[in-house]
Amino acid sequence: MIMDYNRAVKDLNGMSKEDFLAKVCEIFDVSEIEHAADQSEEQLRPKQKGEYSMFLGEKWYLCRLKEADKNPDPVKGLDVSLLQDLLLDPVLGIKDPKTDDRIDFIGGIRGLKELERRVHTDCAVAFAMYPTSIGELFAVADAGLLMPPKSTWFEPKLRSGLFIHEIRQEDTNDSSR
Protein backbone atom coordinates (compact mmCIF):
# COMPACT_ATOMS: atom_id res chain seq x y z
CA MET A 1 0.00 0.00 0.00
CA ILE A 2 1.22 3.51 -0.78
CA MET A 3 0.87 5.89 2.14
CA ASP A 4 1.38 9.62 2.53
CA TYR A 5 4.89 10.99 3.01
CA ASN A 6 4.41 14.15 5.06
CA ARG A 7 6.58 17.24 5.45
CA ALA A 8 7.67 19.26 8.48
CA VAL A 9 9.51 22.56 8.05
CA LYS A 10 11.72 24.02 10.76
CA ASP A 11 11.12 27.73 10.13
CA LEU A 12 8.84 30.11 8.25
CA ASN A 13 11.64 31.82 6.33
CA GLY A 14 11.56 34.90 8.58
CA MET A 15 7.77 35.32 8.49
CA SER A 16 5.37 35.41 11.41
CA LYS A 17 2.69 32.72 11.57
CA GLU A 18 0.13 35.30 10.49
CA ASP A 19 2.16 36.45 7.48
CA PHE A 20 2.86 32.87 6.47
CA LEU A 21 -0.83 31.95 6.73
CA ALA A 22 -1.69 34.97 4.55
CA LYS A 23 0.78 33.72 1.90
CA VAL A 24 -0.73 30.22 2.08
CA CYS A 25 -4.19 31.76 1.57
CA GLU A 26 -2.95 33.43 -1.63
CA ILE A 27 -1.97 30.01 -3.01
CA PHE A 28 -4.67 27.69 -1.63
CA ASP A 29 -8.28 27.84 -0.57
CA VAL A 30 -7.74 27.54 3.19
CA SER A 31 -10.20 26.71 5.95
CA GLU A 32 -9.52 26.08 9.60
CA ILE A 33 -10.57 22.61 10.73
CA GLU A 34 -12.97 23.34 13.58
CA HIS A 35 -12.67 21.32 16.79
CA ALA A 36 -9.59 19.53 15.43
CA ALA A 37 -8.65 18.25 18.90
CA ASP A 38 -11.93 16.29 18.98
CA GLN A 39 -11.45 14.76 15.54
CA SER A 40 -9.75 11.51 14.62
CA GLU A 41 -6.59 11.49 12.54
CA GLU A 42 -8.65 10.14 9.65
CA GLN A 43 -10.91 13.21 9.79
CA LEU A 44 -7.88 15.54 9.75
CA ARG A 45 -6.18 13.90 6.77
CA PRO A 46 -6.63 15.26 3.24
CA LYS A 47 -9.45 13.37 1.50
CA GLN A 48 -8.46 13.75 -2.14
CA LYS A 49 -5.77 14.79 -4.57
CA GLY A 50 -5.14 18.52 -4.41
CA GLU A 51 -5.77 18.74 -0.66
CA TYR A 52 -3.23 19.22 2.12
CA SER A 53 -3.72 19.34 5.86
CA MET A 54 -1.47 21.91 7.51
CA PHE A 55 -0.61 22.16 11.21
CA LEU A 56 0.51 25.66 12.16
CA GLY A 57 0.69 26.88 15.74
CA GLU A 58 -2.03 24.95 17.50
CA LYS A 59 -4.43 24.70 14.57
CA TRP A 60 -5.12 22.34 11.69
CA TYR A 61 -6.08 23.82 8.33
CA LEU A 62 -7.37 22.22 5.16
CA CYS A 63 -5.64 23.68 2.11
CA ARG A 64 -7.22 23.03 -1.28
CA LEU A 65 -5.37 23.57 -4.51
CA LYS A 66 -6.94 26.22 -6.71
CA GLU A 67 -8.13 24.86 -10.07
CA ALA A 68 -5.79 27.09 -12.07
CA ASP A 69 -2.75 25.53 -10.39
CA LYS A 70 -3.50 21.93 -11.37
CA ASN A 71 -0.94 20.51 -13.79
CA PRO A 72 -1.42 17.63 -16.27
CA ASP A 73 2.32 16.77 -16.34
CA PRO A 74 2.80 13.38 -14.58
CA VAL A 75 5.53 14.71 -12.25
CA LYS A 76 4.65 18.40 -11.92
CA GLY A 77 1.01 17.43 -11.28
CA LEU A 78 1.82 15.31 -8.23
CA ASP A 79 0.68 16.82 -4.95
CA VAL A 80 4.24 16.66 -3.59
CA SER A 81 5.52 18.58 -6.64
CA LEU A 82 2.76 21.18 -6.45
CA LEU A 83 3.44 21.82 -2.76
CA GLN A 84 7.14 22.16 -3.54
CA ASP A 85 6.66 24.41 -6.58
CA LEU A 86 3.88 26.62 -5.20
CA LEU A 87 4.79 26.96 -1.52
CA LEU A 88 7.96 25.33 -0.24
CA ASP A 89 10.26 26.91 -2.83
CA PRO A 90 8.80 30.38 -3.45
CA VAL A 91 7.48 31.10 0.06
CA LEU A 92 9.71 29.12 2.40
CA GLY A 93 12.84 29.24 0.24
CA ILE A 94 13.33 25.47 0.14
CA LYS A 95 14.88 25.13 -3.32
CA ASP A 96 16.06 21.52 -3.03
CA PRO A 97 14.20 19.32 -0.55
CA LYS A 98 16.89 16.64 -0.86
CA THR A 99 19.59 18.90 0.59
CA ASP A 100 17.80 21.58 2.63
CA ASP A 101 18.17 20.87 6.37
CA ARG A 102 15.03 22.89 7.15
CA ILE A 103 12.66 20.21 5.82
CA ASP A 104 12.05 16.78 7.24
CA PHE A 105 9.97 13.92 5.86
CA ILE A 106 7.68 11.85 8.02
CA GLY A 107 6.24 8.57 6.78
CA GLY A 108 2.48 8.29 6.95
CA ILE A 109 2.64 5.28 9.24
CA ARG A 110 3.88 7.58 12.02
CA GLY A 111 0.59 9.48 12.00
CA LEU A 112 -0.51 13.07 12.33
CA LYS A 113 0.30 13.16 16.04
CA GLU A 114 3.95 12.99 14.98
CA LEU A 115 3.43 16.11 12.84
CA GLU A 116 1.92 17.89 15.85
CA ARG A 117 4.80 16.73 18.05
CA ARG A 118 7.33 18.07 15.56
CA VAL A 119 5.64 21.49 15.42
CA HIS A 120 5.57 21.56 19.22
CA THR A 121 9.30 20.75 19.42
CA ASP A 122 11.54 21.66 16.49
CA CYS A 123 9.40 22.71 13.50
CA ALA A 124 7.20 25.67 12.62
CA VAL A 125 4.71 24.03 10.24
CA ALA A 126 3.81 20.56 9.02
CA PHE A 127 1.90 19.31 6.00
CA ALA A 128 -0.05 16.07 5.74
CA MET A 129 -0.11 14.92 2.14
CA TYR A 130 -2.72 12.95 0.23
CA PRO A 131 -0.98 9.71 -0.79
CA THR A 132 0.36 9.38 -4.31
CA SER A 133 -1.82 6.87 -6.17
CA ILE A 134 -0.54 3.80 -7.96
CA GLY A 135 -1.94 5.32 -11.18
CA GLU A 136 0.19 8.43 -10.68
CA LEU A 137 3.22 6.26 -9.97
CA PHE A 138 2.67 4.29 -13.20
CA ALA A 139 2.05 7.49 -15.21
CA VAL A 140 5.44 8.83 -14.10
CA ALA A 141 7.14 5.53 -14.92
CA ASP A 142 5.37 5.22 -18.29
CA ALA A 143 6.59 8.71 -19.19
CA GLY A 144 10.16 7.61 -18.40
CA LEU A 145 10.39 10.18 -15.60
CA LEU A 146 11.54 10.01 -11.99
CA MET A 147 9.38 10.48 -8.91
CA PRO A 148 10.25 13.50 -6.74
CA PRO A 149 12.17 12.73 -3.54
CA LYS A 150 10.14 11.37 -0.64
CA SER A 151 6.90 11.18 -2.60
CA THR A 152 5.85 7.64 -1.67
CA TRP A 153 5.86 5.61 1.53
CA PHE A 154 5.20 1.91 1.05
CA GLU A 155 3.79 -0.42 3.71
CA PRO A 156 4.52 -3.11 4.51
CA LYS A 157 8.23 -2.61 3.98
CA LEU A 158 9.91 -5.52 2.26
CA ARG A 159 12.53 -7.22 4.35
CA SER A 160 16.05 -6.53 3.23
CA GLY A 161 17.37 -9.42 1.17
CA LEU A 162 13.95 -10.88 0.47
CA PHE A 163 14.58 -11.02 -3.27
CA ILE A 164 18.25 -11.89 -3.18
CA HIS A 165 19.18 -15.37 -4.29
CA GLU A 166 22.65 -16.66 -3.71
CA ILE A 167 24.35 -17.89 -6.87
CA ARG A 168 26.79 -20.67 -6.12
CA GLN A 169 29.37 -22.12 -8.46
CA GLU A 170 27.54 -25.47 -8.60
CA ASP A 171 24.37 -23.62 -9.73
CA THR A 172 26.15 -22.25 -12.78
CA ASN A 173 27.66 -25.63 -13.66
CA ASP A 174 24.40 -27.56 -13.36
CA SER A 175 23.02 -27.75 -16.91
CA SER A 176 19.99 -29.80 -15.86
CA ARG A 177 18.20 -26.69 -14.63
Located regions from the model:
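Surface-exposed, charge/polar-rich loops and edge strands
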Residues: M1-R177
